[in-house]
C-alpha cells in the first residue's frame, strides 16, 4: 500500500514503464523503457483526469526512453536495446508538437558510425546538449546540436575525456576499468554540468559553444562503486555558496556496496569542487552492509521550485529533499507508490514538476503517479 508524508496522490496513469517524463504547456510527455512502446503524450490540463492523446512506437531492438519538449518541438532519443532492426539506427527523433495530439516527425538525426545512439540530454528549445556515441570514440561523448532548423540539425561543438578519441590517435588508458560514457549534460548559463557515469562529473565552459573547455571535474574512480547520473546546479546561492547536487545511480555497482546516495558540492570556486554533504533516505543504510541494486538513489528532478528537490529513489519512490542548508540536506516529504502488479518492488525512475508544483513520478516497470505536495 502506498505511503505518503507531506504528499497526496492526485491521479494514477496506467502506462508501460518509462525512462523520462516531461511537462510542457499542460501536456505530459512520457518516454517508455521497452519497445515497441516509444512515447505517450497526455493532456493533463485536468491532472485528476489525464487523457492519452497520442502514442509513438519504435522497432524491437531499440528504445526511445528519453523525451524533452519546448517551443513546439519534441525531441526523443533512439538507443540500442538488445537485438533487432539494425537498419533503424540510433540518434534523435525531432517532432513538431505544436498540436500535441498530432506529433509530426520533422527529422531523424543519426549518430555517426555503428554506435548505440543517444542516451540522455538537455534541450532548451533551440540547442540540444546530448550524449551520443560517435565514430572513432570509445563510449558516449558530449555534443551540442543546433535545432534552429529542425529539419537540418547542425553540430556546434563536442567534448570528451582525453583518451576516448582513439581514431584521433589518443592513447586509451582504461583497459582495466569501465569505459568512459557521458550520461548527459545540463546547461545553466554558459556552463554545462556533465555526468560521466563511472568517470564522475565535469564542468564545461561553453561561452564559445564551438569550443567547450574544461573548467574542472571530480572523478572518484573505483573509490565510488556507483556511476554518476546527474550533476544539477542550484540556480542561486545557498548560505553564500554556489551548490551542485550530484546524484549517483544505484545500478552497475563496481563491487557490493550499500545503496547509492546524493552528494552536495560547493562550487563557489568552480575550479575546485568540494564535497560538503551527502543525503541518503533515512533508515535505508543502517549498518553499511551491501544491498541489492535499485534500492537507493536514481536521480533528481531537473525542474524544481525553491530549495526542495524531488528525487526518484528507485524502490523507495519519491523523496523530497530540502537543501536550504547545503551542509545538512534533509528529507521533508515522500511518496512511496504501490508496487506495480507482477513486480516485487516499485522502481521510481524519473520525476519532474510543473509550474503549479504538481509532481509527476514515473515507474520503470509500469505506471505514473501525479502527486501534490503541501510544501508550497
Model-inferred region functions:
Residues 1-376:
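Feature marking well-ordered beta-strand scaffolds used for ligand recognition
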Amino acid at each position: 500500500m502506498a505511503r505518503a508524508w507531506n504528499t497526496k496522490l492526485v491521479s494514477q496513469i496506467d502506462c508501460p514503464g518509462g525512462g523520462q517524463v516531461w511537462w510542457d504547456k499542460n501536456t505530459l510527455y512520457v518516454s517508455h523503457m521497452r519497445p515497441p512502446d516509444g512515447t505517450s503524450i497526455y493532456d493533463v490540463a485536468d491532472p485528476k483526469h489525464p487523457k492519452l492523446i497520442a502514442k509513438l512506437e519504435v522497432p524491437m531492438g531499440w528504445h526511445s526512453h528519453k523525451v524533452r519538449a519546448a517551443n513546439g518541438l519534441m525531441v526523443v532519443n533512439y538507443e540500442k536495446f538488445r537485438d533487432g532492426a539494425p537498419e533503424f539506427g540510433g540518434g534523435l527523433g525531432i517532432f513538431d508538437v505544436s498540436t500535441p495530439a498530432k506529433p509530426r516527425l520533422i527529422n531523424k538525426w543519426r549518430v555517426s558510425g555503428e554506435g548505440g545512439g543517444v542516451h540522455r540530454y538537455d534541450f532548451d528549445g533551440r540547442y540540444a546538449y546530448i550524449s551520443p556515441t560517435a565514430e572513432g570514440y570509445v563510449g558516449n561523448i558530449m555534443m551540442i546540436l543546433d535545432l534552429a532548423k529542425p529539419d537540418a540539425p547542425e553540430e556546434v561543438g563536442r567534448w570528451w575525456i582525453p583518451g576516448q578519441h582513439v581514431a584521433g590517435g589518443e592513447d586509451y588508458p582504461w583497459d582495466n576499468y569501465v569505459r568512459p560514457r557521458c550520461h548527459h549534460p545540463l546547461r545553466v548559463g554558459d556552463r554545462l554540468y556533465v555526468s560521466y557515469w563511472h568517470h564522475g562529473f565535469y564542468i564545461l565552459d561553453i561561452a564559445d559553444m564551438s569550443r567547450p573547455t574544461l573548467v574542472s571535474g571530480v572523478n572518484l574512480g573505483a573509490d565510488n562503486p556507483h556511476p554518476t547520473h546527474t550533476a544539477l546546479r542550484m540556480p542561486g546561492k545557498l548560505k553564500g555558496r554556489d551548490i551542485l547536487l550530484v546524484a549517483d545511480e544505484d545500478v552497475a555497482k563496481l563491487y557490493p556496496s550499500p545503496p547509492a546516495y546524493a552528494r552536495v558540492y560547493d562550487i563557489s570556486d568552480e575550479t575546485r569542487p568540494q564535497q560538503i554533504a551527502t543525503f541518503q533516505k533515512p533508515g535505508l543504510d543502517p549498518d553499511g552492509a551491501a544491498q541489492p541494486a535499485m534500492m537507493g538513489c536514481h536521480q533528481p528532478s531537473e525542474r524544481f521550485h525553491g530549495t526542495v528537490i524531488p528525487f526518484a529513489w528507485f524502490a523507495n519512490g519519491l523523496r523530497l529533499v530540502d537543501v536550504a542548508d547545503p551542509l545538512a540536506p534533509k528529507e521533508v516529504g515522500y511518496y512511496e507508490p504501490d508496487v506495480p502488479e507482477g513486480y516485487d518492488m516499485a522502481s521510481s525512475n524519473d520525476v519532474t514538476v510543473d509550474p503549479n508544483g504538481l509532481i509527476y513520478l514515473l515507474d520503470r516497470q509500469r505506471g505514473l503517479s501525479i502527486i501534490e505536495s503541501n510544501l508550497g
